[in-house]
């Protein structure tokens, strides 16, 4: 189990784009911009995972 001794260190590491654990004063007021390439890559990974899962089920 890992314990973070310095709360400021934890907030500094998790404050990007309003991640959970960041305090409200360090969160940016605007959401992170959505990159279309990242969205396509995420969709491709989901489709590949589903196809791999179906292949595994068929091989059982």
Curated annotation (Swiss-Prot):
<keyword id="KW-1038">Host endoplasmic reticulum</keyword>
<keyword id="KW-1080">Inhibition of host adaptive immune response by virus</keyword>
<dbReference type="GO" id="GO:0005789">
    <property type="term" value="C:endoplasmic reticulum membrane"/>
</dbReference>
<feature type="compositionally biased region" description="Polar residues">
    <location>
        <begin position="14"/>
        <end position="26"/>
    </location>
</feature>
<keyword id="KW-0945">Host-virus interaction</keyword>
<comment type="similarity">
    <text>Belongs to the lymphocryptovirus BNLF2a family.</text>
</comment>
<comment type="subunit">
    <text>Interacts with host TAP1 and TAP2.</text>
</comment>
<keyword id="KW-0812">Transmembrane</keyword>
<protein>
    <recommendedName>
        <fullName>Protein BNLF2a</fullName>
    </recommendedName>
</protein>
<dbReference type="GO" id="GO:0140311">
    <property type="term" value="F:protein sequestering activity"/>
</dbReference>
<keyword id="KW-1043">Host membrane</keyword>
<feature type="region of interest" description="Disordered">
    <location>
        <begin position="14"/>
        <end position="34"/>
    </location>
</feature>
<dbReference type="GO" id="GO:0039588">
    <property type="term" value="P:symbiont-mediated suppression of host antigen processing and presentation"/>
</dbReference>
<comment type="function">
    <text>Participates in viral evasion from HLA class I-restricted T-cell immunity. Associates with host TAP1 and TAP2 and prevents TAP-mediated peptide transport and subsequent loading.</text>
</comment>
<keyword id="KW-1107">Inhibition of host TAP by virus</keyword>
<keyword id="KW-0472">Membrane</keyword>
<keyword id="KW-0899">Viral immunoevasion</keyword>
<keyword id="KW-1133">Transmembrane helix</keyword>
<dbReference type="GO" id="GO:0019885">
    <property type="term" value="P:antigen processing and presentation of endogenous peptide antigen via MHC class I"/>
</dbReference>
<feature type="transmembrane region" description="Helical">
    <location>
        <begin position="41"/>
        <end position="59"/>
    </location>
</feature>
<dbReference type="GO" id="GO:0044167">
    <property type="term" value="C:host cell endoplasmic reticulum membrane"/>
</dbReference>
